[in-house]
């Protein structure tokens, strides 16, 4: 049985990116950095990024990733 409080890989990545302040082009993180900071397996990380990009929660620029304003709003909604 799954823990009802278990977060999806995409939500875990979203929260991790916020926690490491990947919130602008200047603080964007490369895939290797995200892999180090998250506890996600490689395939989970890539799938989570694909999902977050498709929803507009994450922006990719020159191989680095950061949260969009929408992604930041989603994280903030978790804490309020």
PLM region spans:
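A short, conserved structural fragment
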Residues: 53-63
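Short acidic, hydrophobic short linear motifs in intrinsically disordered regions
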Residues: 23-37
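Short, amphipathic alpha-helical interaction segments positioned at domain boundaries
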Residues: 72-80
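Short Asp/Glu-rich motifs
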Residues: 54, 71-72
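Short amphipathic alpha-helical interaction segments
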Residues: 39-54
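Minor-groove-contacting beta-hairpin "wing" of winged helix-turn-helix DNA-binding domains
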Residues: 64-69
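Short alpha-helical segments that sit at the start of domains
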Residues: 1-23
């Amino acid at each position: 049985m799954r823990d009802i409080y278990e977060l999806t890989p995409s939500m875990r990545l979203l929260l991790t990116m916020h926690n490491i302040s990947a919130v602008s082009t200047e603080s964007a993180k490369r895939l290797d950095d995200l892999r180090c900071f998250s506890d996600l397996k490689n395939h989970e990380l890539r799938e989570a990024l694909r999902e977050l990009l498709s929803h507009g929660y994450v922006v990719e620029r020159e191989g680095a990733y950061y949260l969009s304003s929408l992604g930041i709003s989603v994280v903030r909604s978790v804490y309020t």
